[in-house]
Amino acid sequence: MSSVEQKSINIKVIPRSSVSHIEEDLMGNLKVRVKAPPVGGQANQELIGLLAEYYNVSKDQVEIIKGRTSRNKVIRIN
């Protein structure tokens, strides 16, 4: 991704999974399974790390813009 390109994506997060990974359906929607529990922002931090690795950007470029306490989130990748 270039430094000026921004992308907002809808994501469904499933905390307390046995394995952390990202699934993409045919429509391009992401379902992200994280091992961390949804306590104290742990699942959100793991989500940010997984997405940064998936999109090959730094963690600072991944931002939760909606749904910080929900399983359904809108994420911005800068």
State where each predicted segment sits.
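Short glycine-rich loop/turn motifs that provide flexible caps or phosphate-binding loops at active sites
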Residues: 27, 39-40, 66
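Basic side chains
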Residues: 12, 16, 31-35, 59, ...
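A periodicity- and composition-biased signal for non-globular, repetitive helical segments
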Residues: 18, 22, 39-41, 72-77
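N-terminal first-folded block
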Residues: 1-31
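Compact, glycine-rich, soluble single-domain proteins
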Residues: 14-17, 32-55
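Short glycine- and Lys/Arg-enriched binding-loop motifs that mark or flank ligand-binding interfaces
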Residues: 24, 36-37, 63
